[in-house]
Every structure is written in structure tokens, then in C-alpha cells.
Swiss-Prot record:
This protein's UniProt keywords: ATP-binding, Ligase, Magnesium, Manganese, Metal-binding, Nucleotide-binding, Purine biosynthesis
Full protein name: 5-formaminoimidazole-4-carboxamide-1-(beta)-D-ribofuranosyl 5'-monophosphate synthetase
Organism per entry: Methanopyrus kandleri (strain AV19 / DSM 6324 / JCM 9639 / NBRC 100938)
Positions contributing to ATP binding: 146-208, 230
One example of a Gene Ontology biological process annotation: 'de novo' IMP biosynthetic process
UniProt xrefs under SUPFAM superfamilies: Glutathione synthetase ATP-binding domain-like (SSF56059), PreATP-grasp domain (SSF52440)
Family per similarity comment: Belongs to the phosphohexose mutase family.
């Protein structure tokens, strides 16, 4: 595991007046890069061959580093170029998925915005639940074995899959039937099934709440929220019930887009309290706790109580909706999560706090 001291030693050799914000060319890269430029920082993207077009045509990247595969971001040549550019790398879901947690923790010797140690806590269900339970927020009941299923549950699998392979069932027999079908179709394998996370299906409305823990301002901000647009479930529910039954299609929950939403103003108090609790718990678990963006994926029940069913320990894909209403209220202008990150980096540099926002 790379120590924070090793990363800070690298940071100490940077020309702080010539900083870059860098990221992998996927997920939320467009907003991260645009935000860097808006705050007067150089923007750098590491991109796979054949995937540079959006960054070129939209003009958001000052430099494009082309690699054969995303995993090549770990190559020493690429890392050296990032250090030459005085780059601070912003992690996102694709970065975690392609570069890998072991690579990020042990091999990636470039300063990263945020707490790299917390990325594992979002990827492993048992760790994620431990953090949420420590925070004291409401979470769905978890079932240790398919044999214990006695109510509607949703079955999830490890890693950043964007909902692929998830399914709902109500008893052990239905679990076995649906799991076997997914294995036959090549969606999951036996190893995935052994690591299946089975949790109570909470009926409620979906709010994915986008937070920002600011070291510079010493506060936790709620910037905006979205809900997921999932295929094929969102298409199925548009069909009459009789047609759904006749079609015999198995619902899937693969995220294909995001829809901006706002919550009733009276519920914001709960959301701020949840964010504060999660940040305090993260400080106890992996110092210095959350830095910058994180997301709580929640369900709001008919009793107007929030259950947290998933955590993102970095910028979440839902921030691609651009307009974050509470960020607008705070800053008086449209501030994307990408720009909020760059603003924190710039202000931390200007106030001598940069060591506090990287690991």
C-alpha cells in the first residue's frame, strides 16, 4: 500500500503554479476536464485508442495521452508524464474498474484528489455496509444466504457493474431459478454468485445524493441529486401489465442514463445529517475520511425516511446531469461537480492546503 507520505513527497516536487487536473477518458471525464479549464488549471485526459473524439471535438482537454488499454495508465511511462505535468488525478467509476483497486493502492504513484483508501470501501459490499452502519444511517436488511429469503429482495454482485446482472426475487426457489438463467446467459459466473449481496427490496423513490466534503471550507455540501434511468426495467414499466406478462421478459437494471431530481425542501435536513454522519464515520475508518465528492444512493419510503443502499466514494456518474441546484444556490452560478473539484484544488493550493486534499 502506497503511504500518504510517499505521495506527498511527489507532490512536494510539483510546480504548484502549473498544476494539471487529469483523469481517465470515460465516466465523468468531460465535466472534470471542463471544470479544470474553468478554474484556470491545465486539463489532461488519458484515453484509449479510438476514444479521443469527444475530448477533441468538445475542446475540453489541453493534453490527450493515448494508451492502448485503460489499464496502461499504470505504465511507468504514463505515470512519469503525469508527474511531469504536475497532475492531480481525479478518480471516477471507470478509473476504479479499469485500473483496479490493487493498482491504485500499490502502483499508482501520482497524487490523487480524494482519499484513495476509501475506494475499496465502495467496491466491497461488506466494507460498504460496515461504514454505513457505523454512520448510523438506515440501510436495508441483508440476508446471509438465499435460504433465508422471506420477502422481496434485490440481488447484487461485486464491483462497478452499473446494475448489470441484478435481479429481484422473493424466495429461495426463485433465487436459484434466476441465478441459473443468468449463468447460462453468461451475465454472471459461479464466482459472482458466491459473492452475491442479497438485501431487502425497499419500496420507495430513488434519490442519488451528490455530496462534497470540502477541506478548504471545513464543511459537507449537498450539491444535487439524480435518479437512475435503467434498462430494461424503465421500458418494461411503460407496458400494460398484461403485455408484460405475455412478453415474459426478465427485468434488468443496467444504468443507461441519469435524470435530475430535487427533493422536498423539508427533507434536506435529513440529507445533510446523513452526509455529516457518513463523513464522521469515514474519518474513523480511513483517515482523513472523505475528501471531495461522494454519493449516497437512497430510497425514500412513504414515511419519508431515507434508506442508503449504495455508496460511491468518488465522483458519481449522476453528476453528468450538469445542473446541480444546490451548487447554484451556494455559488450563484452553475457549478458542475467537475468544476467544484477544480475549485477545491485551486483554493487549496492558494491557501497552502493542497496536502490536505490529495492522497
Amino acid at each position: 500500500m502506497l503511504s500518504r507520505e510517499e505521495i506527498l513527497e511527489i507532490l512536494s516536487e510539483y510546480d504548484l503554479e502549473d498544476l494539471s487536473i487529469a483523469t481517465l477518458g470515460s465516466h465523468t471525464a468531460l465535466h472534470i476536464l471542463k471544470g479544470a479549464k474553468e478554474e484556470g488549471l491545465r486539463s489532461v485526459v488519458v484515453c484509449e485508442e479510438g476514444r479521443t473524439t469527444p475530448y477533441e471535438r468538445l475542446g475540453v482537454a489541453d493534453e490527450i495521452i493515448v494508451v492502448e488499454r485503460f489499464q496502461d495508465m499504470l505504465d511507468e511511462e504514463v505515470q512519469e508524464r503525469l508527474r511531469e505535468l504536475n497532475a492531480i488525478v481525479v478518480p471516477h467509476g471507470s478509473f476504479v474498474a479499469y485500473v483496479g483497486l490493487d493498482g491504485i493502492e500499490n502502483e499508482f504513484c501520482v497524487p490523487m484528489f480524494g482519499n484513495r483508501r476509501l475506494l475499496r470501501w465502495e467496491s466491497e459490499r461488506s466494507l460498504e455496509r460496515k461504514l454505513l452502519k457505523r454512520a448510523g444511517v438506515k440501510v436495508p436488511k441483508v440476508f446471509d444466504s438465499p435460504e433465508d429469503i422471506d420477502r422481496p429482495v434485490i440481488v447484487k454482485f461485486p464491483g462497478a457493474r452499473g446494475g448489470r446482472g441484478y435481479f429481484i426475487c422473493s424466495d429461495p426457489e426463485e433465487f436459484e431459478e434466476k441465478a441459473e438463467r443468468l449463468i447460462e446467459d453468461g451475465v454472471i459466473d459461479e464466482e459472482d454468485l458466491e459473492q452475491a449481496h442479497i438485501e431487502e427490496y425497499v419500496v420507495g423513490t430513488n434519490f442519488c445524493v451528490h455530496y462534497f466534503r470540502s477541506v478548504v471550507e471545513d464543511t459537507v455540501e449537498v450539491l444535487g441529486m439524480d435518479r437512475r434511468y435503467e434498462t430494461n426495467i424503465d421500458g418494461l414499466v411503460r407496458m400494460p401489465a398484461g403485455d408484460q406478462l405475455e412478453a415474459g421478459l426478465e427485468p434488468s437494471y443496467v444504468i443507461s442514463g441519469n435524470i435530475p431530481v430535487v427533493v422536498r425542501e423539508s427533507l434536506l435536513v435529513q440529507l445533510y445529517e446523513m452526509g455529516d454522519r457518513v463523513v464522521r464515520a469515514s474519518e474513523d475508518i480511513e483517515e482523513p475520511g472523505f475528501i471531495g465528492p461522494f454519493c449516497l444512493q437512497t430510497l425514500c419510503t412513504e414515511d419519508l425516511e431515507f434508506y442508503v443502499f449504495e455508496l460511491s466514494a468518488r465522483i458519481d456518474g449522476g453528476t453528468n446531469v450538469t445542473f446541480l441546484p444546490y451548487a447554484y444556490l451556494k455559488f450563484g452560478e452553475i457549478v458542475t461537480m467537475g468544476r467544484r473539484i477544480a475549485k477545491e484544488v485551486r483554493e487549496a493550493r492558494d491557501k497552502g492546503l493542497l496536502e490536505g486534499v490529495v492522497t
